[in-house]
A protein has these predicted regions:
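C-terminal motif of bacterial Sec signal peptides marking the signal peptidase cleavage site
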Residues: 15-18
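Flexible low-complexity loop/turn motifs enriched in small/helix-breaking residues
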Residues: 20-29, 33-36, 51-53, 58, ...
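Short, solvent-exposed loop/turn positions at domain surfaces
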Residues: 82-84
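Short, solvent-exposed loop/turn segments at the edges of extracellular beta-sandwich modules
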Residues: 103-106
Length: 280
């Protein structure tokens, strides 16, 4: 009898190990509104903004909503024509994605996509605008990019939704093969990314025991930020003004000041103008 029990327990352990070795895509919890789903097996629906990739067919998507932070990828090249809308996709569009599951990664990946539909009036390509700004900053004072392994991005002072901020930051860091951290200079200093070295205000070195001044630097990283400024609407167009900064140290930074871009009635943002540029 004991041998039978031991064999039975051994079989249970082998069965559990076999199940654990087969990871499956994670399906989201069903929403409370049953009309939004097609039964317990999906498809599920999610509204996303196309951040980038419409031309290449590899979409980077930001979950739509002021309090949502999901970032997803979707390869439309592998989808049949009946799944895609007839109108070509564009960066900045809102789309509804009907899917069966998503894989746990970052960004997450949609699986079992059965349909993609455009959302009327959802065009807003501000993400693409700010990606251009970050890339333009990257090209300025290229010496600040030397030895760079980490890119810090702070878009918290823009009107982008949390998911859009994360998607833009990820796309920028990924394009330069760098690790990404999000946060302000103050936050990254507190987290230990940025070093604060005390300096003497008198030159004697006496006040280094209780320093009032510090030299800040990031040995293997560079920080990029965009801050929007208030501006009134102009006629039928919607403008935005902003400042942008690239920072490596207290004496190594580049600035775009008083930049302006205008959104058309169709939701597309123009190229931006720079009021002035500064270097330190």
């Amino acid at each position: 009898m004991k041998k039978i029990i031991l064999v039975f327990l051994l079989l249970l352990c082998l069965l559990a190990a076999g199940c654990a070795a087969q990871p499956e895509p994670i399906a989201p919890e069903l929403p409370s509104d049953e009309e939004e789903t097609c039964g317990p097996g999906g498809p599920y629906e999610m509204t996303c903004r196309i951040v980038t990739g419409a031309k290449s067919g590899t979409l980077l998507l930001a979950e739509h909503g002021d309090a949502l932070s999901g970032v997803y990828t979707l390869d439309t090249q592998s989808l049949s024509k009946g799944i895609l809308p007839e109108e070509p996709l564009q960066d900045g569009q809102l789309i509804n994605v009907y899917y069966g599951a998503f894989t746990e990664a970052w960004p997450m990946n949609f699986g079992g996509v059965s349909s993609i539909e455009l959302v009327d009036g959802g065009m807003d390509d501000r993400c693409a605008l700010y990606l251009r700004v970050l890339e333009d900053l990257w090209e300025k004072d290229s010496g600040l990019n030397d030895g760079l392994e980490v890119i810090g991005v702070d878009l918290s002072q823009t009107s982008l939704a949390p998911s859009e901020r994360s998607a833009v930051a990820w796309a920028f860091a990924e394009s330069h093969e760098a690790n990404l951290v999000e946060g302000s200079l103050e936050e990254l200093t507190e987290q230990g990314y940025i070093t604060a070295t005390p300096i003497s205000s008198t030159g004697s070195g006496v006040d280094l025991n209780e320093p009032k001044y510090y030299f800040y630097s990031w040995e293997n990283g560079c920080h990029f930020s965009i801050i929007e400024q208030p501006m009134e609407d102009t006629y039928s167009l919607t403008p935005v003004t902003f400042d942008a900064q690239k920072w490596r140290s207290s004496l190594g930074a580049y600035f775009f000041s008083n930049c302006t871009a205008v959104q058309s009635a169709l939701g597309e943002w123009s190229d931006y103008t720079i009021g002035s540029e500064m270097i330190s």
